[in-house]
């Protein structure tokens, strides 16, 4: 077994973590430790990302919860990878049933270990691709999965009619949405817009492309 020693020490949680995670803060701390050790050792997180675990990866994802009005629905996280944003959202939305969809077996093993060790009873891990999934969910989330047109195609295949898709994007989100707008409308997306989550809590605020299924 590989010794769990981080390449770079995990940074302490910032004061804002208590506000963003609330009672889930201890779980968030434990997950940060897992990411800084096994996440790095297994290649799910680059060593240079460890100092930015909180601002770039954890808080950045957690604040997306404020965009999810239904607090007792279902959520599917596409291409979960190391669990961002799906695992983080499951912590702050304990009454939402979260499915982490990931095609790679080694990543699924990592996610399953995290779910078990963190005691997240509202999370299940599903190995597969969005094209092969038959379930329909209230919310779909994604981060760094695919360009927006392809992501929309995948997400609209698994979200229920009227359901919401939240794609965490970067600085070029507005330009990407403008370019993809005609495609999104053609394949059944509506009310697509760029929104900000976590304003006043994280700097910079998280940029999200949000749209709904017809």
Predicted regions and their residues:
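Short hydrophobic/aromatic-rich motifs at helix boundaries and adjacent loops
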Residues: 32-37, 83-84, 124-125, 150-154
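Class I SAM-dependent transferase core
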Residues: 1-76, 91-92, 106-123
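Flexible, active-site-adjacent loop/turn segments at secondary-structure boundaries
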Residues: 42-43, 51-52, 82, 143-146
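Residues at alpha-helix caps and immediate loop-helix transition turns in enzyme cores, especially N-
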Residues: 60, 85, 176-179
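Conserved beta-strand/loop positions that form the S-adenosyl-L-methionine
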Residues: 78-80
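S-adenosylmethionine
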Residues: 96-214
């Amino acid at each position: 077994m590989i010794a769990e020693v981080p390449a770079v020490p995990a940074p302490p949680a910032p004061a804002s973590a208590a506000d963003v995670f609330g009672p889930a803060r201890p779980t968030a701390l434990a997950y940060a430790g897992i990411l800084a050790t096994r996440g790095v050792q297994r290649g799910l997180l680059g060593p240079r990302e460890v100092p930015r675990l909180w601002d770039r990866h954890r808080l950045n994802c957690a604040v997306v919860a404020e965009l999810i009005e239904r607090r007792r629905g279902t959520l599917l996280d596409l291409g979960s990878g190391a669990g961002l944003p799906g695992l983080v959202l499951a912590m702050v939305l304990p009454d939402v049933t979260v499915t982490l969809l990931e095609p790679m077996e080694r990543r699924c093993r990592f996610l399953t270990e995290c779910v078990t060790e963190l005691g997240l009873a509202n999370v299940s891990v599903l190995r597969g691709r969005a094209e092969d999934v038959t379930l329909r969910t209230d919310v779909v989330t994604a981060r760094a999965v695919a360009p927006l047109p392809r992501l929309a195609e995948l997400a609209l295949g698994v979200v229920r009619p009227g359901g919401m898709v939240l794609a965490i994007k970067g600085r070029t989100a507005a330009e990407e949405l403008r370019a993809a707008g005609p495609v999104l409308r053609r394949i059944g997306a509506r009310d697509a817009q760029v929104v900000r989550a976590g304003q006043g809590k994280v700097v910079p605020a998280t940029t999200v492309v949000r749209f709904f299924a017809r």
